[in-house]
Amino acid sequence: MNKFIVFDGLDGCGKDTQVNLIAEMYEQQGRKVDIRSHPCSDNKFGRKSKQALLKTGKFNHLKATLYYGLDALRSVHMYYYNKDTDVLIFSRYTMAVAYLPDVVNVIVYKIVSNVLPKSDCMFFLDVSPEESLRRIQSRNEEEEMFENLEDLRKVRSKTKIATYEWNIIPADDAPEVISQKVKDICIKSDQKLL
């Protein structure tokens, strides 16, 4: 694997949009790009995580988190450590720990961030909870358990303790503005490798 890029942030922050824009940039350079958007629908862990996210209650919260973690680990194992992978882009990664209860989330993040691969191209798209909710509601999709203003505010607050290793990009801006900031950081990172 030659290039590892990660996007994370609240639902509705524009992760998938930015994944597609940066993938397009690398594909135009003739690079092979693999995209993993967690939870992934191509394996049982991702599907079970998504099913639990569409339900409510503490048990489903725990199930969603556990299966999400297994889904992400599967992607790391199958793609990050694959010598045939050129550019690997993840939509959602370690910030899922922000959904865990206080104190537990800090401990789990420290463990996860020391075990899983990192990159200088990890982007936290920092959208306001209000803008996040507006974007979520405009999608006309089934609502997940954390897609309400109260939970979005809590989760955004919790992410502040874990984004110290990330490039924090304000995400209330237009997609093109965000994309240019992301591209500038990725290009600078690529130049270090030359």
Residue ranges and their predicted role:
Residues 7:
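Hydrophobic anchor at the beta1->P-loop junction of P-loop NTPases
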Residues 12:
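Walker A (P-loop) phosphate-binding loop of P-loop NTPases
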Residues 24-33:
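Post-Walker A helix-loop "phosphate-sensing" segment adjacent to the P-loop in P-loop NTPases
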Residues 34-110:
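ATP-dependent small-molecule kinase phosphotransfer cores
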